[in-house]
Amino acid sequence: MSFVVIIPARFASTRLPGKPLVDINGKPMIVHVLERARESGADRVIVATDHEDVARAVEAAGGEVCMTRADHQSGTERLAEVVEKCGFSDDTVIVNVQGDEPMIPAAIIRQVAENLAQRQVGMATLAVPIHHAEEAFNPNAVKVVMDAEGYALYFSRAAIPWDRDRFAASQEVIGDTFLRHLGIYGYRAGFIRRYVTWAPSPLEHIEMLEQLRVLWYGEKIHVAVAQEVPGTGVDTPEDLERVRAELH
């Protein structure tokens, strides 16, 4: 099947300045992500960045770059600029791979593209089971609940669904009902164009989760359980050291 991967790579980062270019065993992190995306079988892989140093690193690795503005408020807004600059048709399948996921399996990049292509929906994403209470109650682990057809009902930083009877007795054992959302999305290009015309929603501001804008406006997001669990993403210096050890 035909799809395009876009990797937003914003240079500024509060916790890890210059994050796309941090060295992981001899390569900039963004190059590791680029290589994983290429392995997915995508027709094109484009790195969207606002910084010349990132562009140079990607081009040195033979990658394609689209320079974007620095003032985007979200990764989806950056994607929309790339969609317009590249002139993608509305039915083009776009997969958004985060630029700080050097251990993302190529298989799940393709999985989200295939899931979207098989459905009449504008957006698709993935999740993985949560097995430990610490993760279920961690606000940095976004949870998702779905309907019977696999469409998202809600995303939250809270522990959803709340297991009333189980948690009344103990919050140390969580059962098998929790799913952690992965930050990988598939879209049709036309859906991205529509998304950026919508005003941010109140729920989006409360939870700080941009995908809630989609549900607020009555659109569907398909969610599937990922075929493989991705490795550690890089948000902090501690994450970086962990990834360096795992990729050694």
UniProtKB/Swiss-Prot annotation:
Pathway: Nucleotide-sugar biosynthesis; CMP-3-deoxy-D-manno-octulosonate biosynthesis; CMP-3-deoxy-D-manno-octulosonate from 3-deoxy-D-manno-octulosonate and CTP: step 1/1; Bacterial outer membrane biogenesis; lipopolysaccharide biosynthesis. GO terms for biological process: CMP-keto-3-deoxy-D-manno-octulosonic acid biosynthetic process; lipopolysaccharide biosynthetic process. CDD domains: CMP-KDO-Synthetase (cd02517). It is found in: Cytoplasm. The keyword rRNA-binding does not apply. InterPro entries: Cytidylyl_trans, KdsB, Nucleotide-diphossugar_trans. Pfam families: CTP_transf_3. Its EC number is 2.7.7.38. GO terms for molecular function: 3-deoxy-manno-octulosonate cytidylyltransferase activity. It catalyses: 3-deoxy-alpha-D-manno-oct-2-ulosonate + CTP = CMP-3-deoxy-beta-D-manno-octulosonate + diphosphate. Keywords: Cytoplasm, Lipopolysaccharide biosynthesis, Nucleotidyltransferase, Transferase. One of its GO terms (cellular component) is cytosol. Its main location: cytoplasm. PANTHER family: 3-DEOXY-MANNO-OCTULOSONATE CYTIDYLYLTRANSFERASE, 3-DEOXY-MANNO-OCTULOSONATE CYTIDYLYLTRANSFERASE, MITOCHONDRIAL. Activates KDO (a required 8-carbon sugar) for incorporation into bacterial lipopolysaccharide in Gram-negative bacteria. Belongs to the KdsB family. This is 3-deoxy-manno-octulosonate cytidylyltransferase. It comes from Enterobacter sp. (strain 638).
